[in-house]
Amino acid sequence: MKLFPVKTTLAAALLAATAAATAAPTWITIGDKAHALVAKVAPNARTLASRQVPVNVPVSRGSAALRASSEGVHVVEIDDGMLPTLSLAIHRNQRKCGGFLKHETMAEALAVLHRVDGAPEQELAPSYAIDNQTIVNALLPQLQASNILSTITQLSNFQNRRYNSTHGVAASDWLFNQWKALNPGNRRDVQVRQITHTWAQKSVEFSIIGSGNSTETVILGAHLDSIASGGVETARAPGADDDASGVAGLTEVIRAMMAGNYVPKRNIRFIAYAAEEVGLWGSQAIVNQQPGRRDKVVGVMQLDMTAFQGDSTDIWIYTDFTNAAQNQFVANLVGAYLPGYSVGYDACGYGCSDHASWHNKGFIASFPFEASDATYNFQLHTPNDTIATFGGTANHALKFTKLALAWMVELASDGTPAQAQAAPAATSKTASR
């Protein structure tokens, strides 16, 4: 996610990266603030096109009332070897990760620029009726903060989970095996797989095939990797909050659904993305692997940092580069299933987590977050992003796990509460690719 600003010169890093940079061009879309660093990091980069993108932002931090605003988004041609240095500059100067997305071709980047407001096709919008209380209320009590904390602990015990380190590879393999173990009855409608990319770390996916409308899919995501300054292998980056907390939330929702023999009507996919911290590479690659499947995704939610309560508000919903109708649905779910929890609203800028990869291609996406943009966990991307930073409990993360379960069941059950029947048992489909 984001990074607390530190007063560190980038001269040495820039010099080394410049020397190592290749001449191979690549194309990125990048927000205004991050774009201001491009000339310093890569003087030979070229801005090819720019656009002011309309966004909705709160009239004041926390307010549900929104006002129309805009953010500049730019298409930049840059040497591929300079992207890690650009990432580092954004981390250190603007207390955030992401801020840009890498694209395979110039044409793809330009196409994203011209639809980055993410306006969905009308026929993709699902019903946002809250009408699956029987299923949701049966599953919510199964969610346990202790289970979430256990997963966070195990993930943060890796030296780091960097996308190109042996530790990052091992973390992906560990999660793959953990998710496989959540299907002990070998349900044949369940598939667990690793998704291979052009870098070392694999994304991990747990999916359940819908029993009825299996041409439509609901996606809950988090990112698996972590990052901190230092060597690829030696840097200590526990990433307990960023984003072991989100992955742990996904894991607990899967566990509860499997224990409750939940069978969705729509397909559901849980995805732990690789390489979020260096520009949303994993989610971008997965979105790009879906030609012909675009009209099947009816909703996306991202859990990225859920464990640190930075202020008195329980759940923050970020309104820029997300879908307003689904955001309202998320807020309505809090009122329906999490009574007493408060909701605030804020904005985080272009490309601040993996939901942006989906939003940029026109999919409906939302991003609930642990705190406001001013009060979140500033220890991320450091060796201090540990369980101790958020008090040694997963009580705050449990709120988001409950919200994610309610969201997924309400969308995946397609308004039919009777879908929580016993699941079919047979050999599961388990693959690695």
Predicted region positions:
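N-terminal hydrophobic or amphipathic helices/low-complexity stretches enriched
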Residues: 108-165
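Solvent-exposed loop/turn segments at secondary-structure junctions
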Residues: 160-163, 197-201, 210-214, 224-228, ...
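Fungal secretory targeting signals
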Residues: 1-23, 433
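A non-catalytic alpha/beta surface segment that caps or lines the substrate-entry region
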Residues: 58, 62, 150-209
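Acidic/histidine-rich catalytic neighborhood of metal-dependent amide-processing enzymes
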Residues: 200-203, 234-325, 329
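Fungal extracellular Ser/Thr-rich, low-complexity intrinsically disordered regions
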Residues: 25-26, 35-37, 51, 55, ...
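Second-shell loop/turn segments in exported
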Residues: 134-143, 156-167, 191-194, 232-243, ...
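Active-site-adjacent substrate-binding region
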Residues: 311-424
